[in-house]
Amino acid sequence: MDDIREHYQISHPESDPAVEVSAPITYTTLRAVHLDQVHDLLERSFWSGINVADSLDYSPERCTVVALYKKLVIGVAILSSPRETYITYLAVRCGWDNSQIATWMLYHLIKLNPGKDITLHVSANNPAMLLYNRFGFKAEEFITGFYEAYLDPQSPASKNAIRLRLRQL
């Protein structure tokens, strides 16, 4: 980003340099105001047509975590419901990958649902597998073609999935 600003300043010496104000990353519950950005992030991360508006109806304070930088949604994690505790989506905006956002969102979901097993499916070649392993998730099943109906045939992502479970007794 610094190189873009420097290029702009060289190209436009008459303009005053912009003052950048940094802000903390905040974590909050999913709200209707976030939905457009969340849907865009999930489409970029997974596939088109994802709609998580119904997550607002199922205890969003226990089942959703949204990471914000100022008003920009930079991450989202969603459980299907407090009873089922299945992670349907966990995504971080491109460029924010090494900011520990996924780690914090996963940590929050686990803490919001104590004593409940948490399950998820992850693409067999997804690097998020390392994150889940660090939290203690264990592989239960390998499912061939799990993502076949969702992924573009040209996608480098594996169409096979591994079902993982975090046991919390």
Where are the regions a protein language model picked out?
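Active-site acidic-Proline motif in GNAT/NAT acetyltransferases
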Residues: R93-G95, S99, A124
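Conserved catalytic-core motifs of GNAT/GCN5-like acyltransferases
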Residues: D3-E6, T119-H121, K138-K159, R163
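Conserved N-terminal entry element of GNAT/NAT acetyltransferase domains
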Residues: M1-A32
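Conserved GNAT acetyl-CoA-binding A-motif
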Residues: K111-A124, L131, I143
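Generic preference for well-ordered alpha-helical elements
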Residues: M1, L35, E84, T103, ...
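Conserved acetyl-CoA-binding loop-helix of GNAT-fold acetyltransferases
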Residues: N98-K111, L130-R134
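A conserved beta-strand-loop-helix scaffold within acyl/acetyltransferase catalytic domains
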Residues: F46-G95
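Helix-loop element at the rim of GNAT/NAT acetyltransferase active sites that forms part
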Residues: T29-A32, L41-N51
